[in-house]
Amino acid sequence: MNTEATHDQNEALTTGARLRNAREQLGLSQQAVAERLCLKVSTVRDIEEDKAPADLASTFLRGYIRSYARLVHIPEEELQPGLEKQAPLRAAKVAPMQSFSLGKRRKKRDGWLMTFTWLVLFVVIGLSGAWWWQDHKAQQEEITTMADQSSAELNNNQSQSVPLDTSTTTDQAMATTPTSPVDTTATNTQTPAVTAPAPAVDPQQNAVVPPSQANVDTAATPAPAATTTPDGAAPLPTDQAGVTTPAVDPNALVMNFTADCWLEVTDATGKKLFSGMQRKDGNLNLTGQAPYKLKIGAPAAVQIQYQGKPVDLSRFIRTNQVARLTLNAEQSPAQ
């Protein structure tokens, strides 16, 4: 009779109540049960209160209850009816399988998108490279054109300087040749009594002597004595007597070259003060009317001083391009 009453009483108790009673009979606390089962105290409390945590799957909850029952020596068969009520098994939601054709279509679309992206990327890279090459080629052609112009101007200057040297030599020859007749006249005046027939004139003597030969003969003939100069004649003025030291121009442009460099300098009147190639370790001093317009083929190879102050060319050196700048009276270079 007592056994049947106890069995009915156990059936009337819920799963959580039976687990709590068994725990209390063994003298265990919720903390001790949680530590042995490696669970949270809140989970043990929810199991004893017949609560199913929302964030806990029913499969895990049933496993926790079985472990709790084994700990407090309760057969699992007695708790089976309560488990079906407290933690019923739910059918897992299985996502429908996608069609193979749908996945293939999506993969094909992704492939076209990736191909188009790579195509656009290649086009952008190609256009950037073409733009850089055109700019680089234009700079090289400009430098080549500048060098050709400077070579042509140097050739013209050399061809024009030849007549000037010839005329100078001719003038020197003409200035020195009259000394011979003077000596001949003086000799004739010293011997007036001698009368002799005039010798035949050699045609070669009357021939015009080229300026180069006249210069050589005059240089070979010794200078006349001091008696050939009249007593009342004054000495000729020398060139050094009229030499004066020019004043330093405050707008002077000084350039020192550390490597070969093409250069063109123009002043405010449009006059080209210099246009050509400067060699390494060369110096150039220019004076004109400010502002000056400069065009430099290799900015890294030249150091410029204007009004006694250096001119900054770092922005042209960093970009490695032809420098075009203007130096005004206030020394503010502008591109």
From Swiss-Prot:
Q: Name one GO biological process term.
A: regulation of cell shape
Pfam families reported for this sequence: HTH_25, RodZ_C
Residue span of region Disordered: 148-239
Q: Domain comment, in the record's words?
A: The helix-turn-helix (HTH) motif in the cytoplasmic domain of the N-terminus is involved in the formation of spirals to maintain the rigid rod shape. As this protein is anchored in the cytoplasmic membrane, the HTH motif may contribute to protein-protein interactions to form the RodZ helix, which is localized beneath the cytoplasmic membrane. The C-terminal domain may be critical for determination of the rod shape by probably interacting with enzymes required for synthesis of the peptidoglycan layer, including PBPs in the periplasm.
Q: What is this protein called?
A: Cytoskeleton protein RodZ
- Similarity annotation: Belongs to the RodZ family.
- Topological category with respect to the lipid bilayer: Single-pass type II membrane protein
**UniProt KW Cell membrane keyword:** yes
